Design a protein with these regions (language model features):
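Catalytic-core signature of thiol
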Residues: 168-479, 512-519
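Short, surface-exposed beta-strand/loop patches at domain edges
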Residues: 504-564
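Extracellular/oxidizing-compartment recognition motifs
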Residues: 85, 146, 471-474, 553
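Short strand-edge motifs at loop-to-beta-strand transitions and within beta-strands
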Residues: 481-483
Length: 564
């Protein structure tokens, strides 16, 4: 069945597209002047369509973010940003440094090559009229050629500018087994030694996978564990919120070669080589969502209970021959690992004590290659703690993504605040520099299905000015986590004047939906209440000072670019 449809209301356009991409049998003589005329008309039409703009719908919902918008090629074909296929169509893709691109969804596999018309769709070699191309550092692919392979239809109407991507049949079906190692999407196994740094090894190993195989970087564990701002020594351990806070505040990551592990020293002056702008915290024991994250986004950091401490340890819960671990007791979590794959058919008989059914996650450990299967092992789906907390780092950008970050919550999400109901308002006030425009804000969703509206108030003098707010963005987060929201339109900020960013947040089932930084215990002794001006409100009309009345900072950052 043909699964992509062209809706073209102007017959001349249809004829032009046909003439430019398909030859009849026999010999057709065309002189250079004819070819130039056809090419010129195609380019002009493509330019007109792109200038008018295309509206993208995926499964009936409009995709409003500009970063996902397609464009019309000079051959009058749709070119779609590769990341849209991952983020909106739940495909997985890998870009290799040699230009090869592999895109998968369900059983379909499309193999393309950057700047080449040679392709392989479901094992068959084909020629495509438009080669994948890099444009403004983004990879675009000819979607109508591969939509069928990915179980999607592609309908577009040149007259209205509407592009519709609609899945065919069931939701994405994950394979029964998947292993990031086979896809070249993991970095080397490392050894934490006798320090309590598993949490940082897991966080950074997961972070590294989000870049692979296009970029292969190794990040510094010493820098994360010794420069995070928390009052914790390396031997004392840590957890994922510390990792997110360190990364979200742009303290890191830095490269391992610039701050090597195990030398008992660090360099706090190093600059982050990447900027984390988003991390998803997946629902408790949502195994399907964890698999989808591994398949489409990157390795997933999770925590387990382990009575082993290194590669030389043994445990009644660990089968050394099969490298299989299953714990069904009541002890709490004490060790972080990274999920890099799964096998639904991994036999329950591989474990010392058989869980109720087959199935296991493939996990990367931080005890060196002498442990397990070259540093990896299998954890049963039915382990007491696997996937209770699952973190995937989903938006890691270059260190030049914004010119400036405004923040007062360098320790990140320490606690929560609210008014005993699921929604609330919170705001942060900052003083702009010269010639700046506000591009984005970031904050935490403390649980799944959180909705938000983001507002901006310029020329702030007191809380009365918060009533003069302008709506600049809205949306929903599927999972808890840390998110950066791009504004619908940039906001020019008055030079050296105060401005306020305001969020109305709704978290179903929550009584305290606002993430805050405060002095909770000895770990947060470095908390600085003097560096922020935050406010909270129930209805957005009466505001309370976060610092003066609640002794906290609200977690709400702002990102700007220079205009000159």
């Amino acid at each position: 069945m043909k699964k992509f449809v062209y809706i073209i209301l102007i017959l001349a356009i249809g004829a032009l597209a046909y003439y430019g991409t398909k030859e009849p049998s026999g010999r057709l003589e065309k002189n250079e002047e004819d070819q130039h005329a056809v090419s010129g008309m195609s380019e002009k039409l493509a330019g007109d369509y792109n200038e008018a703009g295309l509206t993208l719908y995926v499964n009936g919902s409009e995709v409003e973010e500009d970063e996902y918008k397609p464009y019309v090629s000079n051959n009058l074909h749709l070119m779609m940003p590769l990341k849209m296929l991952k983020d909106k169509m739940k495909c997985t893709y890998i870009e290799y440094v040699n230009g090869s691109i592999v895109i998968k969804r369900n059983e379909g596999v499309a193999r393309l090559v950057l700047d080449s018309q040679d392709a392989e769709l479901d094992g068959k070699d084909v020629k495509i009229a438009d080669a994948p191309i890099k444009k403004d550092d983004e990879t675009f692919v000819p979607i109508e050629y591969i939509a069928d392979t990915l179980d999607y239809t592609c309908e577009y109407n040149y007259d209205t500018g509407r592009v519709s991507m609609q899945k065919v049949g069931e939701d994405s079906k994950l394979p029964a087994a998947y292993d990031m190692r086979k896809e070249g999407r993991v970095t080397e196994v490392r050894d934490q030694g006798d320090s309590g740094t598993c949490w940082a090894f897991a966080s950074l190993a997961a972070l590294e996978t989000t870049l692979m195989p296009d970029e292969k970087l190794q990040f510094s564990v010493d820098n994360m564990t010794m420069n995070n701002g928390f009052g914790v020594e390396q031997f004392e351990g840590g957890q994922y919120r510390m990792s997110i806070a360190y990364l979200a505040s742009w303290k890191g990551p830095v490269l391992e070669k610039d701050d090597p592990y195990g030398d008992d020293k660090t360099n706090s002056k190093l600059k982050a080589v990447k900027h984390l702008q988003e991390a998803e915290i997946i629902d408790d024991k949502n195994l399907k969502a964890v698999k989808e994250a591994v398949y489409t986004k990157g390795g997933v950091e999770t925590a387990i209970y382990s009575d082993m401490i290194d590669a030389d340890s043994s445990s009644e819960y660990y089968n050394e021959e099969t490298h299989a671990y299953y714990y069904d007791g009541s002890e709490g979590i004490n060790h972080d690992v990274v999920i890099v794959g799964w096998d639904d058919n991994y036999s329950k008989n591989n474990f010392n004590k058989a869980p109720k059914k087959d199935g296991a996650f493939i996990c990367k450990n931080s005890w060196g290659t002498e442990f397990g299967e070259d540093g990896y092992f299998y954890i049963s789906y039915y382990d007491a703690h696997i996937c209770e907390t699952s973190v995937v780092y989903t938006r890691l950008e270059g260190a030049d993504n914004y010119d400036k970050i405004y923040q007062s919550d360098k320790l990140g999400w320490v606690g929560v605040l609210g008014f005993d109901q699921e929604d609330a308002y919170f705001a942060n006030v900052y003083t702009a520099g010269k010639s700046e425009e506000l591009k984005a804000v970031s904050f935490y969703a403390t649980d799944a299905k959180t909705t938000y509206e983001v507002y901006v108030a310029t020329n702030f003098e007191d809380t009365d000015d918060l009533a003069n707010k302008k709506l600049v963005a809205s949306g929903e987060m599927e999972y808890a986590g840390y998110y950066t929201v791009n504004l619908d339109d940039v906001v020019k900020l008055p030079d050296e004047k105060k401005f306020a960013v305001i969020v109305h947040i709704t978290t179903p089932g929550s009584k305290y939906p606002i993430a805050i930084e405060y002095d909770a215990d000895s770990m947060t002794d470095s908390f600085d209440i003097s560096d922020g001006e935050g406010y909270i409100s129930l209805y957005g009309n009466q505001w309370y000072s976060a610092e003066k009345e609640r002794k906290c900072n609200v977690c709400l950052k702002a990102f700007t670019d220079k205009t000159e």
